From Swiss-Prot:
Its EC number is 1.13.12.-. Keywords: Flavoprotein, FMN, Monooxygenase, Oxidoreductase. FMN binds at Q190, G195, G224, W243, C244, G245, S246. This is Putative monooxygenase Rv1533. It comes from Mycobacterium tuberculosis (strain ATCC 25618 / H37Rv). The keyword Iron does not apply. CDD domains: NPD_like. One of its GO terms (molecular function) is nitronate monooxygenase activity. Binds 1 FMN per subunit.
Amino acid sequence: MRTRVAELLGAEFPICAFSHCRDVVAAVSNAGGFGILGAVAHSPKRLESELTWIEEHTGGKPYGVDVLLPPKYIGAEQGGIDAQQARELIPEGHRTFVDDLLVRYGIPAVTDRQRSSSAGGLHISPKGYQPLLDVAFAHDIRLIASALGPPPPDLVERAHNHDVLVAALAGTAQHARRHAAAGVDLIVAQGTEAGGHTGEVATMVLVPEVVDAVSPTPVLAAGGIARGRQIAAALALGAEGVWCGSVWLTTEEAETPPVVKDKFLAATSSDTVRSRSLTGKPARMLRTAWTDEWDRPDSPDPLGMPLQSALVSDPQLRINQAAGQPGAKARELATYFVGQVVGSLDRVRSARSVVLDMVEEFIDTVGQLQGLVQR
């Protein structure tokens, strides 16, 4: 599976694994793939610790870091707002809605210690993500990825000065062209099937459109990819690698809350929904009572980023804490970002096994396809 992407990344396989869990990142890189740590909610101190740990456990294997750089968000015109400012901008009606929701589902309050351990928020403004970039570039990362918008020129220049590749996620060919114009090295064409922030165009349609739009810039396919057959399809569409996220959420290494992991394992591909209820921007997640409550006609519209995250971060902590108790009604609310491929996630495996199974099925699939054209 030697492609330009594999060569650029220095990985054996062009399989990129996006995860917020350092253990998954390290395991995938050690298995020949390319682990990418999602750092948007990390403090600089925590990111320093996580990257140090990854490097100690990968023996020089390549890995990357993903940050969230949206061009539009509340407070962007003033260079961003901090967590306290975001909380002060939350309308009282939204607070009341969430408080009532938690009461109806029997969610207890968290302790101050639990709340402080989860503090952080989304670092999406320059003053929020620059300290994270300082930490990242002080380590031996191979790639920095930008989600929700073209990377700023200073980021591209800084990355290239450190011999670090720049990737950016795109949900349309138009987005991809803007990324290419910004000087990125890799473009991730992410279809609507994907978990997390997505657009409305399906992977099968999007990938060839993006490949044609940005050639010769290499493209990775994302959205609905968890098996070797899907990797073969992605490469047939013109991609030179894949970007996967959902498939790692049910691995042994994943930090996914047990209740949510069980829900993923039982879900079908029809059990996800694009909702603004967690971040304020459309993101695909598991459909649960949480998303249904926000979709009710009498519910308030979710707030823009980062206010929605500021509103629901503490309630989400409380829900996950309560959902672990047997028979808790909180289990109905528990959700997390995941793509439609969740319907294929039916057992817990190690991240290494996932990578090797992908490669084996890819080889078998390509062999079968070659047989179709032999005369």
